[in-house]
Design a protein with these regions (language model features):
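ATP/NTP phosphate-donor binding region
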Residues: 454-540, 814-815
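Carboxylate- and glycine-rich phosphate/diphosphate-binding segment that chelates Mg2+/Mn2+
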Residues: 263, 271, 606-718
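Rossmann-like NAD(P) dinucleotide-binding subdomain of oxidoreductase/dehydrogenase enzymes
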Residues: 93-232
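Gly/Pro-rich interdomain helix-loop hinge
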Residues: 733, 740-823, 866
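Glycine/threonine-rich beta-strand-loop-alpha-helix active-site module
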Residues: 154, 524-638
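ALDH superfamily catalytic-core signature
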Residues: 8-10, 202-330
Length: 868
């Protein structure tokens, strides 16, 4: 051992011992796992070999307990703790996941202050020194004054073996002359307190200003149900309660027995050597349990015969337990307290609920958070066990188990960690609610290496396209029985649904049509359609029209399949669509959804988005979830040939903004970039002719149809940005067509996003620096717009967009559309805040401040050169 070790009896000597221990720990912290494990093995071996001498010394010094049982406790503290942690990593990198970029590194805490109780003076010392050595911590022990000799002897055994195996000298120290003053000093100066003792000591530990692992008192009740194995239950309680004369804090303090088996249980206790007190004897023992309201120290760890003699009661020397049949669970009843001796309260319960109530009171009043025990048939009594586990505020619920042995773990259940310090959680005023082990003596550093998100590309299962493809694509639906068509009155009255209806008739599919969809569809409209669906019970839904009809169809689909769905929940904002709080209901279980667009713009046929308006509040609910993706999309330009100019312009420019925002999005990928670029090229080349010539240029119409769908699939996966956020609110507040609103904002957004020094950049792992200017330059290059620098290319792109807007009759400013200036300015702040909170804002490459959104609105209202 350390021959230079000086006794610690004063504050100065303790300060010196702490300094030496801290220096030793700093050296120990550099040891490898192999060195630590060698020391851990040597220390556990030495403690195990000294289990009998230490047990004898503990009983001789304290006058409490049973030598043979203390031998078992010492053996347990050495063998079971070693076995539990021999293969555990506690040095350096203890866990690594290269795929996720995570490393966990274990570091020691430093110097541990260990308070040791008189009830388990050697086994607890062995336990705490071993787990400290395994975790490369130093430890200073404050023994109980009544057990200082045996506690120090146990610590000395572990220290000698550890140093011989290579541990630094002074890594374990102790107070030779314990006092409240020195205990408080060591708790103040240590890095962590590991306190096992009475409530006063635990409270002092938590009041020291240092992190503490303190445990509370136990007052374990054991409920014996009428389904229990009585022989097992009684023998288990006796085995536990007599172990070391009841000094394990988890030992049973009372049994609560159902009335139907009470007499049989009582008889079994008597048969097995327990002594049931009569009324007079109960009073005498009651007066001996508590002295001035506190537990009588003279009964702790004594035999039943000795305690009876103290109370003036004559019992056989062989009596195992003194049992008092009592009725009150109140604190005024001495038998209802923790007794730390072979004295047991016995209660009669009318039924299991009554038994649980009694046990609950006993736990809350005397052992909150510690341990509760129950004996029952775990098969037939499963519901009772579940009820018991739910009701008891105890961190260990032991079933058919002697609680002294069961509570400390690894004896009757091998997943319960072995420990001699049992946490009681917040109920017991503790910071830990489990059996204390090595993980509680480590600081774990987490090294998180940047990783990029998993990306995806989601699209409808089938996308059919080509002018005239409608009847061929519909033929795939031949096995469906009943079709529900969703459209608007204009399309229905002008025969747009007729080709679909004729094909359905030819295939023998019964069908009906809902044609009350209006622009900006409402919840009332969707509910009306869903009610008709519920009555018709289709297995096929066909949404025919522009964005409104397809969105309405999607919402009706949701209401039809999940009438319980809450739109406020479904419209909840998300940062990552895969991590959203709300789980969207599974779609497609009742009906197969087909989208057939009649406009080239919204791209709703290829997106998981839908917007619905609550007509009572005016609130728009934007829904986004891949469950809303159509199962099939049929993009047939024949359905779009006769779209009016205004619709062609608004929907066409909407598709431009879809592609531009998808390309600039933080979540853009190679999969979406190609779609976005190709759709932009097709739009710039074909939108003017589609606008001017309509059906006279079927190729332009077809190219626009394809471009709109491709742009939709691009933003379905890359998402949109702040242009759409502002357009949504501009349209809602001032009733501008959605595509026009986007057209009015896009120039401002391009310049805003292109800033090389943004106030805030967006947050997404793949987005590592502001590069949107370069992205816009790539678009200009792809469109062959010219320019030498990225800045020139951006201006050329904006000019090209402005020229395109002019060709299709879109005005330059918001004011040009007759929006009253006073009304606009009055409602501006509300519009700004709602735009900021729009779902689309999150994917924007530049995270906008509300003041910046406001300025963009003002620029778009007055024109950039005329901004007030």
């Amino acid at each position: 051992m350390d021959k230079t070790y000086a006794p610690v009896t004063t504050a100065q000597e303790l300060t010196e011992a702490l300094a030496k221990c801290r220096a030793a720990q700093e050296k120990f912290a550099t040891y490898t796992q192999e060195q630590v494990d060698k020391i851990f093995l040597a220390a556990a071996t030495a403690a195990n070999q000294m289990r009998i001498p230490l047990a004898k010394q503990a009983v001789a010094e304290t006058g409490m307990g049973v030598v043979e049982d203390k031998v078992i406790k010492n053996h347990y503290a050495a063998e079971y703790i070693y076995n539990a942690y021999k293969d555990s990593k506690t040095c350096g990198v203890i866990e690594e996941d290269t795929a996720y970029g995570i490393q966990r590194i274990a570091e020691p805490i430093g110097v541990i202050a260990a308070v040791i109780p008189t009830t388990n003076p050697t086994s607890t010392a062995i336990f705490k020194t071993l787990i400290s050595l395994k975790t490369r911590n130093g430890i200073i022990i404050s023994p109980h004054p009544r057990a200082k000799g045996c506690t120090i002897a146990a610590a000395r055994v572990v220290l000698e073996a550890a140093v011989a195996a290579g541990a630094p000298e002074g890594i374990i120290a102790w107070i030779d002359k314990p006092s409240l003053e020195l205990t408080n000093q060591v708790m103040r100066e240590a890095d962590l307190i590991l306190a096992t003792g009475g409530p006063g000591m635990v409270k002092a530990a938590y009041s020291s200003g240092k992190p503490a692992l303190g445990v509370g008192p136990g007052n374990t009740p054991a409920v014996i149900d009428d389904s229990a194995d009585i022989l097992l239950a009684v023998s288990s309680v006796i085995h536990s309660k007599t172990f070391d004369n009841g000094m394990i804090c988890a030992s049973e303090q009372s049994v609560v027995v159902l009335d139907s088996i009470y007499d049989r249980v009582k008889a079994e206790f008597i048969k097995r050597g327990c002594y049931v007190l009569n009324a007079e004897e109960i009073d005498k023992v009651r007066a001996t349990i508590l002295i001035n309201g506190a537990l009588n120290a003279k009964i702790v760890g004594q035999s039943a015969h000795t305690i009876a003699a103290l109370a003036g009661v004559d019992v056989p020397e062989t009596a195992k337990i003194l049992i008092g049949e009592v009725t009150s669970t109140d604190l005024s009843e001495a038998f209802a307290h923790e007794k730390l001796s072979p004295v047991l309260a016995m209660y009669r319960a009318s039924d299991f609920a009554d038994a649980m109530n009694k046990a609950d009171t006993l736990v809350k009043d005397g052992g909150y958070g510690h341990t509760a025990s129950v004996y029952l048939d775990t098969v037939s009594g499963k519901e009772k066990l579940d009820a018991f586990a739910e009701k008891m505020k105890a961190c260990r619920i032991l079933v058919n188990t002697p609680s002294s042995h069961g509570g400390i773990g690894d004896l009757y259940n091998f997943k319960l960690a072995p420990s001699l310090t049992l946490g009681c959680g917040s109920w017991g005023g503790n910071s830990v609610s489990e059996n204390v082990g090595i993980k509680h003596l480590l600081n774990i550093k987490t090294v998180a290496i940047r990783r990029e998100n998993m990306l995806w590309f989601r699209a409808p299962e089938k996308v059919y396209f080509k002018k005239g493809c409608l009847p061929v694509a519909l033929a795939e639906l031949k096995n469906y029985k009943k079709a529900f068509i969703v459209t608007d009155a204009f399309l229905y009255q002008n025969g747009y649904t007729k080709p679909v209806e004729e094909k359905l008739d030819a295939m023998g599919i019964t069908h009906t049509t809902f044609y009350n969809v209006a622009p900006d569809p409402t919840l009332a409209c969707a509910r009306e359609g869903a009610a008709q669906m519920a009555a018709f019970k289709p297995d096929l839904i066909l949404a025919i029209g522009g964005g409104s009809a397809m969105d309405a169809g999607k919402i009706m689909w949701v209401l039809y399949e999940h009438p319980e769905a809450d739109f406020q929940d479904m419209a909840m904002r998300f940062v990552d669509i895969r991590k959203r709080v709300y789980t969207f209901p599974k779609m497609g279980e009742k009906a197969y959804f087909v989208a057939i667009p009649t406009t080239a713009g919204t791209g709703s046929e290829g997106t998981p988005f839908a917007v619905i308006t609550d007509e009572t509040t005016g609130v728009k609910y934007p829904l986004a979830d891949y469950e809303l993706l159509p199962k099939m999309s049929i993009v047939d330009a024949d359905m779009m040939m006769n779209a009016p100019k205004g619709l062609t312009a608004a929907s066409g420019i909407d598709a431009v903004t879809h592609a531009l925002e998808a390309y600039a999005s933080m979540m853009a990928t190679d999969y979406t970039d190609g779609l976005a670029l190709r759709s932009l090229k097709l739009i710039f080349e074909n939108l003017p002719s589609a606008y001017e010539n309509g059906a006279k240029d079927p190729k332009a119409r077809e190219n626009m149809a394809n471009a709109a769908c491709m742009a939709g699939m691009a933003f379905a996966n890359a998402f949109l940005g702040v242009c759409h956020s502002m357009a949504h609110k501009l349209g809602a507040f001032h009733h501008l067509p959605h595509g026009v609103a986007n057209a009015l904002m896009i120039d401002e957004v391009l310049r805003f996003n292109a800033a090389e020094v943004p106030a805030k950049m967006g947050t997404f792992s793949q987005y590592d620096h502001p590069h949107t200017l370069a992205r816009y330059a790539e678009v200009a290059d792809y469109l062959k717009l010219g320019g030498t620098t990225d800045e020139e290319k951006l201006e050329n792109l904006i000019t090209a967009i402005d020229e395109l807007k002019a060709k299709i009759g879109i005005k330059k400013t918001i004011r040009d559309y007759g929006i009253d200036e006073t009304d606009f300015l009055t409602r501006l702040d509300s519009m700004v805040e709602q735009a900021f909170d729009d779902q689309c804002t999150g994917a924007n490459p530049r995270y906008p401040l509300m003041s910046e959104i406001k300025q963009m609105y003002l620029n778009a209202y007055y024109g950039t050169d005329e901004t007030k």
